[in-house]
Amino acid sequence: MKTILFITALFMSTLLSAQKPVEIPLWPNGAPNTNDLTGDQEDLDGGRVANVINPTITVYRPAKPNGMTILMCPGGGYARLAMNHEGHDMASWFNTQGITYAVLKYRMPNGNREVPLSDAEQAIRMIRQHAKEWGINPNQVGVMGASAGGHLAASLST
């Protein structure tokens, strides 16, 4: 019983000591390409978003970084993004492993397949630029995704 209590306390202290997530704009001076979408981002039920105009990464830094980082690309059929269950909800697990975790909120292609890819490329550049500050190794940045985000991750890796 004491062992279970100790492990639970250790796990909770790791979660609580991780830093608060930070959302960083990918293109503060405007994106280099367009998908011709206008208007405001649509926040849908279940933590989904559509019509992303200003792409970002949300970075979750662990209390004790091991140097590795994962960029997560949520899915949504290239029409919307399942930001919570295919993104933010996994952050605490990665952080308990010492892995810095970043969730990409990317723009939809809307006929221009380069738009989401350029957002993913910029996210990797930004992660590597902050390597020293975040305690990560710029050569240990991985990417993963779910559904359309998996396609984007695979495209980024080629």
Where are these regions (language model features)?
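Short amphipathic alpha-helix adjacent to the substrate-entry channel of hydrolases
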Residues: 83-102
